[in-house]
Amino acid sequence: MTDMPTLDAIRQAPKALLHDHLDGGLRPETVLDIAGQVGYDGLPSTDAGELASWFRTQSHSGSLERYLEPFSHTVAVMQTPEALYRVAYECVEDLAADAVVYAEIRFAPELHINRGLTFDEIVDAVLAGFAAGERACAGAGCPIKVRLLVTAMRHAAMSREIAELAIRFRDKGVVGFDIAGAEAGYPPSRHLDAFEYMRDNNARFTIHAGEAFGLPSIHEAIAFCGADRLGHGVRIVDDIEVGLDGDVKLGRLAAILRDKRIPLELCPSSNVQTGAVASIAEHPFDLLARSRFRVTVNTDNRLMSDTSMSQEMYRLVETFGYGWSDIQRFTINAMKSAFIAFDERLEIIDEVIKPRFAVLIG
């Protein structure tokens, strides 16, 4: 096989996914089906193809705030245990079909209480869906491990409660905590109590930072909050200078981010949709990769971006000319950065990822 991977070949490659929102990855048919079952009549279309196109078009908004608006529809159909279970199960199926071997999926339980569910009931339903999906995929010959991150919305005041939820379920499939939502006006430091609680319990967390807002958000996430990873972090490019001779000079913040090997959960297609970057070609992914930051490739929201891990990888291959060794490096970066135990990470790298890439590389 040549060193320039095709999309079909990339679909065979093992992948590790760290940044994917459960409520951003539903199948359009499932949105319609559940909407009919629960009596939700707010959808813009009753045709699956048209609905998928609508989500993609609406999400290509140029701002994070407008990008988040279509989620009102997916969240509306995820308010019962049955719906949450189904969406979680299908998420596992869809990822396994794309050769994802490890994934951390995140969602905000506080958005799913409209029909009276408790946080524990919500998380139980999602974890049950994941577990059933894993069993089904293993039986079908495409094993996958899926774990959960619970997210608190940064504009709300529930982050400590959600952090406590993460710890309650830490031995049942929840491997970490996150904050998400509009960055401007809602700095990570508003949630210090939640992050301190996670650290006090020796637990891991990531923070959406440097997506729509700049370096101050990244600085707070690292220096004040102690984030283990950064969700997006794309604006770290504002602290990097590239000279006319191509020489790269890192600012103090960029340098410590690289030196501490803090993983960047980069989501190329999503970053274009939200206006964080103008195009894939102008995305700093390649600059960061060449500068040896811990870069990872992610989908963010598969429905909204009409994407998959294979498609995200292929867009980078097309744009930056990456080969198999690059894709393998990005995949191992992600697996090294996962919130599961070291021996579990090593097992997946040594027994799944490296052997399968060896076959692809030839």
Swiss-Prot record:
Keyword Zinc, does the record have it?
yes
The record's InterPro entries line, in alphabetical order, gives:
A_deaminase, A_deaminase_dom, Ado/ade_deaminase, Metal_Hydrolase
Which reactions are catalysed by this chain? adenosine + H2O + H(+) = inosine + NH4(+); 2'-deoxyadenosine + H2O + H(+) = 2'-deoxyinosine + NH4(+)
Any GO MF annotation of the entry: 2'-deoxyadenosine deaminase activity
Q: How is the cofactor bound?
A: Binds 1 zinc ion per subunit.
Biological processes per GO annotation: adenosine catabolic process; hypoxanthine salvage; inosine biosynthetic process; nucleotide metabolic process; purine ribonucleoside monophosphate biosynthetic process
Entry EC number(s)? 3.5.4.4
Signal peptide positions (record): none
Residues bound to Zn(2+): H19, H21, H208, D300
User: Which keywords are on file for this protein?
Assistant: Hydrolase, Metal-binding, Nucleotide metabolism, Zinc
Q: Where is this site: Important for catalytic activity?
A: H232
| Alphabetical list of Gene3D superfamilies matching this protein | Metal-dependent hydrolases
Residue numbers annotated as active site: E211 (proton donor)
EC primary class:
hydrolase
The residues that the entry says bind substrate are H21, D23, G181
What are its cofactors?
Zn(2+)
A single Gene Ontology CC annotation of this entry is: cytosol
Query: What protein family does this chain belong to?
Result: Belongs to the metallo-dependent hydrolases superfamily. Adenosine and AMP deaminases family. Adenosine deaminase subfamily.
Q: What does this protein do?
A: Catalyzes the hydrolytic deamination of adenosine and 2-deoxyadenosine.
Q: What is this protein called?
A: Adenosine deaminase
Annotated organism of origin: Mycobacterium ulcerans (strain Agy99)
Q: Which gene encodes it?
A: add
